[in-house]
Amino acid sequence: MMKNVLLIVVAALFIASANAQQHRIKVACIGNSITYGYGLPDRTTQSYPAQLQKMLGEPYQVKNFGKSGATLLNKGHRPYMQQDEFRRAIDFAGDIVVIHLGINDTDPRDWPDYRDFFVKDYIELIDSFRAANSKVRIMIARLAPIADRHPR
């Protein structure tokens, strides 16, 4: 799964680099524990944002703004937009924003009651990044599947 996300992101970023100016292209990776690198022996080198930085090299500045347990839903149990990582990502004003959020929203505390807000909250998140950088390119990563024996 992570390999597919990386390949898609790398391909899109190379296309974006054709239009890049002389400055380093800033890439903000937004997400939950998958983005953060939770459970990895060394998330600073093994998380997908760290791997993406290695693959893209010096013309890019990739930053990890993942927050373990984060939800996309603003009424979820840990709304991403209420986290420090979100504020830092907005301040970073990425040229490209990769969003991988939504898996924690399937939690029974969130989805049954708030699922109708999912699209609205996604648009609000995207609009926040557009307000920080009107020329930002937004990429939404496909969610990792939940195993069939997972309690959700």
Task: Walk through the language-model features, giving the residues of each.
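A short helix->loop->beta-strand "cap" motif at the edges of active sites that frequently abuts
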Residues: 132-138
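Bacterial Sec-dependent N-terminal signal peptides
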Residues: 1-22
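Conserved SGNH/GDSL esterase-like catalytic core that processes O-acyl groups on lipids
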Residues: 23-28, 34-120, 147-152
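Hydrophobic positions in alpha-helices of CheY-like receiver
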Residues: 125-129
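Residue-level detector of functional hotspots within protein domains
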Residues: 6, 13, 82-83, 124
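Carbohydrate-associated surface elements
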Residues: 144
